[in-house]
Amino acid sequence: MSRLRRAGRSGWPVAGGDCHSLGGVTNDYIKTGSPIYARSFEIIREEANLGRFPEDVEPVVVRMIHAAADPAIADLIAFTPGVAAAALNALEAGAPILCDASMVATGIIRSRLPEHTRIICHIKDPRLPAIAEAKGCTKTAAAVDLWQEDGLLNGAVVAIGNAPTALFRVLEVIHEYFVD
């Protein structure tokens, strides 16, 4: 990568311009949060293939890339036209955000949501291990069934992070309950 430089005798790669080493450890780096945060998004916009995304979807894609730390995932992201407006409308109408993993729920910036938005993640629900075992599935897939049983799924915003079985189960439930 063009942004990497070698530091000191150890040759460890470090980000930034000219690196000064102190026994192989660089002291030339951004040291405060705000500039690091801003530069991260600049790098994403420089390196990711964002041109095919509509204006309302692009910020979501940029956040996904930031979370994954991989600009190449932009080429793997699919979207339905109108998805951003539909999600915003759902949230403004009081829909919850259903998350497969605590990491996803924690990463949601609550200050950017309508005030009473519920963020729901059942992964620590004590019922899940038994439900998953009885159904022969993962806990995250069983959590999707709990969302449906509790009447949460219809109209919700679903955020899937690192549990593909949750995504597959969401698609199955949508097909089973919501598609004619």
PLM region descriptions:
Residues R112-A159:
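Long, charge-dense
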Residues T140, G151-L153, I160-F178:
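Glycine-rich phosphate-binding loops that contact phosphosugars or nucleotide phosphates
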Residues I108-H116, E172-F178:
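Short, solvent-exposed amphipathic alpha-helical segments in soluble enzyme
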